[in-house]
Amino acid sequence: MSLGALYVVSGPSGAGKSTVCKLVRERLGINLSISATSRKPRNGEQEGVDYFFITAEEFERKIKNDDFLEYANVHGNYYGTLKSEVEERLKRGEKVLLEIDVQGGVQVKNKFPEANLIFFKTANKEELEKRLRGRNTDSEEVIQARLKNSLKELEYESKYDRVIINNEIEQACNDLISIIENGVK
């Protein structure tokens, strides 16, 4: 049995990663690897579908037990990828899609050099801000923190194998599907 392939999607908050990954997952019939997080669910998010929602204390126990392939504290909340889920799926020959922060993407690449890292971004800062405000889920303080953090996240772009500028959802979906189906690096 051949090993599967690992695809890591990262980029600033508001770049459209979640939207595109959800559509690609539906179209290709592959499952997004579900990350764990200590943050509260957003409207419409479901436990075990969008994330494993756990307490900060439980997350810290899992860190101590070395249960994560990668993890980070982003905007005051923990996010991480459980090693067991990814390793089992790769052994079964599945294509695994991770949607994680840029620091986590680099951590994964260090542990799995064959991973395909795909960086999502918007055409400009104004579009990013428009999308963040359009969510209607974050306070002004959180939006400003996310915008400030996006400048740091953009510095990681060169560490990624491919870049998708998400100006239009359908084109971004097609670009990601092409990378997954063709193994294009």
Curated annotation (Swiss-Prot):
User: Which subcellular locations apply to this protein?
Assistant: Cytoplasm
Q: What reaction gets catalysed by this protein?
A: GMP + ATP = GDP + ADP
List GO terms (cellular component aspect). Answer: cytosol
List the SMART domains hit by this protein, alphabetically: GuKc (SM00072)
Task: Tell me where in this chain the Guanylate kinase-like domain is found.
Answer: 4-181
What SUPFAM superfamilies is this protein classified in? P-loop containing nucleoside triphosphate hydrolases (SSF52540)
Question: Could you confirm whether the keyword Nucleotide-binding appears in this record?
Answer: yes
One Pfam family in the UniProt entry: Guanylate_kin
Query: So where does ATP get bound?
Result: G11, P12, S13, G14, A15, G16, K17, S18
Where does this protein chiefly localize?
cytoplasm
Q: Which UniProt keywords apply?
A: ATP-binding, Cytoplasm, Kinase, Nucleotide-binding, Transferase
State whether keyword Cell wall biogenesis/degradation applies. Answer: no
**GO MF annotation list:** ATP binding; guanylate kinase activity
Instruction: Cite the EC number.
Output: 2.7.4.8
Write out the similarity annotation: Belongs to the guanylate kinase family.
Write down the HAMAP family for this protein, in alphabetical order: Guanylate_kinase (MF_00328)
Q: What does this protein do?
A: Essential for recycling GMP and indirectly, cGMP.
This one is known as Guanylate kinase
Species source reads: Fusobacterium nucleatum subsp. nucleatum (strain ATCC 25586 / DSM 15643 / BCRC 10681 / CIP 101130 / JCM 8532 / KCTC 2640 / LMG 13131 / VPI 4355)
Source lineage: Bacteria, Fusobacteriati, Fusobacteriota, Fusobacteriia, Fusobacteriales
